[in-house]
A protein has these predicted regions:
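Extended, folded domain segments that form the structural surfaces/walls around functional sites
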Residues: 104
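An acidic/histidine-cluster motif and surrounding catalytic segment
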Residues: 1-101, 112-156
Length: 156
């Protein structure tokens, strides 16, 4: 099950179909994996607070992933995205908010499934998987030079 919680009006004001975009991207990233995921569309302040508490980084970011303990199955974990940060990234990178949100949800869910980008080899593998999933969703390659790329700070 994919649960979408929207705690920032910015998301639905800018993208009325935000919940549907999230659900579609999360399902695509899960593929055949069984389990529950919660995706929180939040304000940057909430993301900054979580980033400070769990990663000791006192700043907002685009997406945070919090994998659940194996004993919590079927809950796989939570993904949190900050509206203003994501919207600014999308604009800077010349992407629609819908496409950027799809990418960040796929990225976050892959972290819940154990994917990472701590070194170049892991990053290349994870990015290739993201490209494949996003292509199935009709979203352009987010890592193409003209599209920019998401910030890689490591998984949370």
């Amino acid at each position: 099950m994919i649960e979408v919680e929207i705690d920032s009006d910015g998301w639905t004001e800018a993208l009325p179909e935000a919940a549907a975009v999230v659900e579609r991207a999360a399902r695509a990233a899960l593929g055949t994996v069984e389990g529950d995921v919660v995706v929180l569309l939040a304000a940057d302040e909430a993301v900054q607070d979580l980033n400070q508490r769990f990663r000791d980084k006192d700043r907002p970011t685009n997406v945070l992933s919090f994998p659940a303990a194996e004993s919590a199955f079927p809950h796989l974990g939570d993904v949190v995205l900050g509206y203003a940060y994501c919207a600014a990234e999308a604009e800077t990178q010349g992407k629609t908010l819908s496409d950027h949100l799809s990418h960040l949800v796929v990225h976050g869910v892959l972290h819940l499934l154990g994917r990472d980008h701590e070194d170049d080899a892991e990053a290349e593998e994870m990015e290739a998987e993201e490209r494949e999933i996003l292509a199935e969703l009709g979203v352009s390659d987010p890592y193409a030079a003209e599209n920019g790329a998401i910030e890689h700070e490591g998984a949370a």
